[in-house]
Amino acid sequence: MQDPPRRLSAVPFLSSFFEGRRHSASDPILRLQQGRRSSAAKVLSSSSLQVMVAMSSVSCAERNPTCPERKRNSGRPTPKYTKVGERLRHVIPGHVACSMACGGKACKYENAARWSEQEQAVKGIYSSWVTDNILAMARPSTEVLEKFCIIEQFRSHGIKSIINLQRPGEHASCGNPLEQESGFTYLPEAFMEAGIYFYNFGWKDYGVASLTTILDMVKVMTFALQEGKVAIHCHAGLGRTGVLIACYLVFATRMTADQAIIFVRAKRPNSIQTRGQLLCVREFTQFLIPLRNIFSCCDPKAHAVTLAQYLIRQRHLLHGYEARLLKHIPKIIHLVCKLLLDLAENRPVVTEVADIPGLSAEIEKTVSEMITRQLDKELLRHDSDASDSFTPTAVVMDFENQDVVLSSEQELDPLWKRRNVECLQPLAHLKRQLSYSDSDLKRAESLLEQGRTPWTVPAQALLCHNPRQQKHISRCYSPQSPQLDLNKETLVRNTFSFWNHTKFGVPEGLKDDGSLIFHRTSIPKEVQRSRTFSSGISDSYNPGEPVTPNSANIPKGPNSSQQKVYHCECESHGGCGPSSVAEDGETCRRPVDCGSSPKAQFLGNETQNSKYLSEVAAHMPLQSELSVEARRILAAKALANLNEIAEKEEVKKKVEMWQKELNSRDGAWERICGEKDPFILCSLMWSWVEQLKEPVITKEDMDMLVDRCADASEALFLLEKGQQQTILCVLHCIVSLQTIPADVEEAVLARAIKAFTKVNFDSENGPIVYNTLKKIFKRTLEEKRKMTKDNPEPGI
């Protein structure tokens, strides 16, 4: 049994013996080579040695830009430098890198003469508008500020903030000399004295920042965009600047990383330069996924978390006033309680609307233009006879061969997938203006008359596989043939943003000329300041969702009961979109009396979900007609889940729909403010509490509360801050409903205890848990009612 180990133990001995003989025989040669290398190293400078090390550490395949691996990965955005170039930029001394890459004192990025007018969005600076509100630019200098009146240009463009991503003393050998006071090529005080906010985030050149640091930058950028337009610069305004803007787009619109990179590069060529920077955007996208997850029980699913863990994630995303307000309270708890009180008191949901920049139309327009430009090039190569052989796939293959920004249609597929399903409706209705000037409308009509693709329609939507229809496509992009196929024109008009702002608003009245004025659901003031105000695919229009009239928000006139709203009616071509087009091109309208009809009027196609919504919405006018006391009792019954109106199964379906919305779309936080059914709101809130990994009040907490039950008024303060504030938020909502029947209050407390503890009354320790917490909760309600009576204060 011991023989095999002995034979194996001899192997290392023999191996070391032969290795030793081999090394001893070659020792003189090794010493000679080392001597030659050391003598050569003395001649070379340390920087040259670093360059040689960088070169030698890169394989031949990595040095070859035509490597087959790179060709296979051409479907995704690729770095602008080779691996050799990236490593050299990290080892070459700063002054050498400046002279080689930028031009040294004659730095091309700081020389306006090197760039065309199109490359100078702000004259005198190499700059580009990535969106209508975000300017990417090279660093300015004191000389440039004075020579080209940059600050005056900033004012004329509405730029209110400048974000500097450089470190003091960086690129000292490039362009104009650095200012001794600041370490930059300009003095920040020059901007601040002009009323322009200045932010500085030190970020190493060609490097990346930590994900939490980037998230902080993005939140600051979000806040700055609420004040006005933002200018961002590093040195050239390409690498670090592009990364920050791409991360902002990911944060604000839920774009994928590659979509954001493609979009930024389309507006600012050569942005996001290194592999590390590309990886940074992709990792930031993954970093946000669990932070955005609210309901772990539905798609997109994630691991369940405790209340404390959720509050930590929430703090990462919130900022400003909202972050301070909701430091220890889950947003969904606070919002549902507030909405419930607003419904009970028949108050308007929102009091103020912030001036919000919208990104959705810009993104759609840019992507559409990127595709259209390539289609135009392809169509110009073929005459009408050759159009039969033209297919979208062939164009996409040609895109890849040309190595253009949009290398494949699949890269942007997630961005358009939902819109294709939903008839390509425009996005972000809550964030875009609902009234347009005459020039806007004329420009919209001219786009349709010229056969050009509108902002919200991707060019692929007009492509088809029928060769005869493809001839119509060629004419669609030809200025000589402005005539459109009527079905296509109907599609275009139905998807154009000017005709589709009826989802979230109800008509307030009519202008003298008969045009519609829409009411708009607004955002609560405390939520406005810190929300991401540029949603992308999150606010896509769903033609199946109805417009629920809210009589509480319609101004009462002398004949308010006879107010009319215009309902879009389909008359031809089987169209049933939000606004159908008659043969004369005018939008068909007919008045509908909302007051006399027991059912709510809706716009657009009715899907399975909207059918249910219409049934629920039919009760809304009835709720608004109830007295204040009746509405308060109804809200309390909703908290207790004493549902007497809608079927529980239907409420469950709607709750599941809201769970998915809140998980996948930022705009859901605004849309939920339009939910008027208190039973749906309360069921949504309790479902969130019950899906936590651990109950809000754990078994250990209960043991502690049972021991301290004698002092019921102070018992809740023994819990953690998050537990205490979450429970108090719900109890404050109950107090704000004022006087409600005792049996209803008992039912509300029982429902709250069940949700907070995940314990049923008929379980083993159920009676002890319920009696203990009911005593504590009732004592807390008494104290709060006494405080409210002495010092009345508004709701949550």
Curated annotation (Swiss-Prot):
Its EC number is 3.1.3.-. One of its GO terms (biological process) is cilium assembly. The keyword Glycosyltransferase does not apply. Pfam families: DSPc. Coiled coil: none annotated. The modification Phosphoserine is found at residues 435, 437. The keyword Iron does not apply. GO terms for molecular function: protein tyrosine phosphatase activity. InterPro entries: Dual-sp_phosphatase_cat-dom, Prot-tyrosine_phosphatase-like, PTP, PTPDC1_PTP, Tyr_Pase_AS, Tyr_Pase_cat, Tyr_Pase_dom, TYR_PHOSPHATASE_DUAL_dom. Residues 126-297 form the Tyrosine-protein phosphatase domain. Keywords: Cilium biogenesis/degradation, Hydrolase, Phosphoprotein, Protein phosphatase. SMART domains: DSPc (SM00195), PTPc_motif (SM00404). It comes from the Eukaryota. The active site is at residue 234. One of its GO terms (cellular component) is cytoplasm. Belongs to the protein-tyrosine phosphatase family. Non-receptor class PTPDC1 subfamily. May play roles in cilia formation and/or maintenance. This is Protein tyrosine phosphatase domain-containing protein 1. It comes from Bos taurus. The gene is PTPDC1.
